[in-house]
């Protein structure tokens, strides 16, 4: 009985994700990451990398270019997906300045309005429902 008991308190993202995989995903692995970027999350938190890696602007040769709202996958083809989307909305002029400000925004992109950001989330979730 104790082997199925997992603490619900943790400050370690890797521990949290690995526990979710253990409890809820029979294969204990993430099949797809549609917003992979450089995969630093997997390396930093010791989470097994997904077989299917997509990104709108791939940084690595093994990552396939794809918009997460239109994945090149069959319906019902995977069991688990990791989604780490853009989370910022701004119209600030600092995005166009050539300086060290807004590093996150410049690297990952932003949406001009919260409404557009939330629409991106909604469209992405509809697509994930299709492939899961």
Predicted regions and their residues:
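Class I S-adenosyl-L-methionine-dependent methyltransferase catalytic core
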Residues: 1-132
């Amino acid at each position: 009985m104790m082997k199925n008991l997992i603490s619900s308190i943790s400050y370690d993202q890797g521990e949290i994700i690995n526990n979710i995989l253990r409890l809820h995903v029979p294969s204990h692995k993430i099949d797809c990451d549609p917003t992979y970027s450089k995969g630093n999350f997997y390396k930093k938190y010791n989470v097994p990398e997904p077989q299917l890696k997509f990104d709108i602007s791939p940084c690595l040769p093994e990552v396939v270019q794809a918009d997460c709202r239109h994945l090149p996958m069959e319906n019902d083809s995977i069991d688990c997906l990791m989604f780490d989307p853009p989370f910022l909305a701004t119209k600030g002029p600092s995005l166009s300045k050539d300086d060290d400000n807004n590093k996150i925004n410049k690297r990952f992109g932003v949406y001009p309005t919260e409404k557009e950001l939330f629409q991106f989330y909604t469209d992405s979730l509809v697509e994930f429902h299709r492939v899961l």
